[in-house]
Amino acid sequence: MKKFFFLALMAVVAMSTHAQNVQLHYDFGRNIYSNEEAGRPKVTLTLEQFKADKWGSWFYFVDVDFSRKFTESAYTEISREFNIGNKGFAAHVEYDGGLSKTSSFQQSALIGAAWNGHSADFSKTYSVQLMYKHYFKAYDYSNAYHSFQLTGVWGLNFADNKCSFSGFVDFWRGEKGNGHGELVILTEPQLWYNVTDHFSIGTEVEISNNFVYNVYNDKKFFVNPTLGVKWNF
């Protein structure tokens, strides 16, 4: 459930040649913040795919948010990395954007560098990305502006691969309505119990500051947990 205001990034970086999964999450955010997040969708379907090749790797995810009557929105992030040498460094390019039933997300393009690594058995993986980020003008009341983004991604399998802990953390410069900058923080750790090699049950917790669009009051920090299932192809 990675956004519907936004978001950047992500992922369960699976350091294999090919990995794909689909997730279904029930979000408790609206139950916790009934005023500030009164319009937050409760159900999100996520599709993720990672594919490595001889030049580097592709990664994308798509989040689709549902209400009882509508498909509320769809948000995607698509990235490509090109390996630089054999020490884990890579060039990183990315596109973020999406649509809702009434509008669209402000699109952005990112370019920068990544440092990726893993343990010998691939049970531990990590990626650190530092990128220039450009937001494109979306509406008459929005502005194109320059930004940056620092992203960390991790994956950890433990308990004889019966459990997985993965997620990402993003730091980027957002822009307020008055044009002043602000630091946006978003992290979405996931904890899964792997019932089989393909089926998992678990949770994702979206923790953010200056990320949720809140017109009810001046609250900026939110913790939104989910209950989810995942199928690994």
List each model region and its residues.
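Sec-dependent N-terminal signal peptides
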Residues: 4-15
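Solvent-exposed loop/turn segments connecting transmembrane beta-strands
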Residues: 37-41, 65-73, 99-107, 135-147, ...
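Outer-membrane beta-barrel "beta-signal"
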Residues: 221-233
